[in-house]
């Protein structure tokens, strides 16, 4: 998919703001509402009334909690999967068995981590081994990912998180999406009235929003953490100080062939002592990042949202080219808040996703459309199954691009998008052959179409602790290495390029237009699946820009409708269908299947976007667990052999 706007001459339209005095950081320490796990009636999401300010955070206590010794057994690693059976001429083959051979490690022990880098997985397992809870391990995983996979996520980015409480069977959501500065202007990505080049916008100071991942994790930890906040950064601080070997993937994105060639700042941060850019296998130490993590450990999120680091972020975003408007007041005012997830039935299970500005509602709509077809009776080698998948995807994107945005600023018609009568109407538009791109449904909202381009600098991970609590978290700096600007050893996001560059389309306002204080719409949609008894079934998610929704939907269809094993579901080919574009992994589809799609009007082309990076954990009905990591990236799924139960929650555990 081409993600470039036409390039036009730069005109300076934003002047640098004077730095404002900091106000006390008050990242949300809100109590979560009674979260839902079943499928309640969904109200339309509308801009709420002004909410009272969240109470201020105090610095974390420094008294360490007593921790049991970690288990001494080495964790087991998930092996790679083999190919699916080839399609047979004339008729699709029988559905593969649920698990014809061991495709992923399976265990009755509940402590698991699946993430995009083995060192991040080990960091999470280390915390679980000390008796930590799932949320504790999530903090450690994110801290390590910011070191070993900095091109995808980190301290300077944002995230969405779902949390499953095994004691209550409930699912909660928390929004750590980046926020536009108060002075952000609707036209800030326009030049002479036209959208500027996408790369030009990405590498500008205007692209950076207030990062939310750390504020979100601290808010979540205050409610559902077990160990002290300070302990959770120890693995990443140790690795940043002592060094780690650069992975092939990190080295690839530092190379000249990267879709976003490294900026001068990125090259300076990720270079050897001789000045050459890091190569695969080089030992990389990041002492500045270690200092940042130590400050976060000692001071909590104040270390990021106030003081020296906050001032450095503001200074970095006010540099040419195209300086932005981020202020210390914007940073100090960041809030993360608990909310109820959106949960809907699919194939006898309940699928839960975050509410807007996540695009989880679009994923639920696509699944609902597919349930109006016979896709569940088909197999993954049947061209008709993939045709139905593609058409449902196109319908989903048409509605998503028009209606989904930050509900604090525009009404999002969640209930209407998921209404059974509306779903039936949308599904009826799927004919025998692919035609022109479908139009969005008429929901009595005068909105323009959103043409936002979404990059793929993102990561997803899943944690299950010894008590069965679960974290499913998608985290991002947006594009590869975010804005290309760095401070204190980490990368700043370019999340504001997830807004539509033009505030109107055809004279109608665009829901996802830029506005000060607004959070851009996101395709990130971490998933937790539960059964009718509110028991945990699966947690999964993926990076991949706007294709995240299709990567997730493919995996859910394969797992819940086609009854494939977890690893088979993750490794199925990816197919992307949005508007006029049909792309996919041609080498993973059989010639017979591709021919069948051509007969139905779909000519797949090789995709230009970054591939999926699915990570998932599944609980079987016999109580055993299975983890899977997408072979398209460097991730692993590993379990921790018998561990002590998580430490009991102490008052003020932050």
Residues covered by each model-derived region:
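Bacterial N-terminal signal peptides
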Residues: 11-23
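Compositionally biased, proline/threonine/alanine/serine-rich low-complexity intrinsically disordered stretches
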Residues: 27-98, 647-654
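Active-site rim segments in enzyme catalytic domains, especially the processed small/beta chain
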Residues: 147-154, 158-173, 190, 324-327, ...
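Noncatalytic scaffold domains of N-terminal-nucleophile
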Residues: 82-122, 126, 134-135, 139-300, ...
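Short beta-strand scaffold segments in enzyme catalytic cores
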Residues: 153, 158-165, 459-463, 526-528, ...
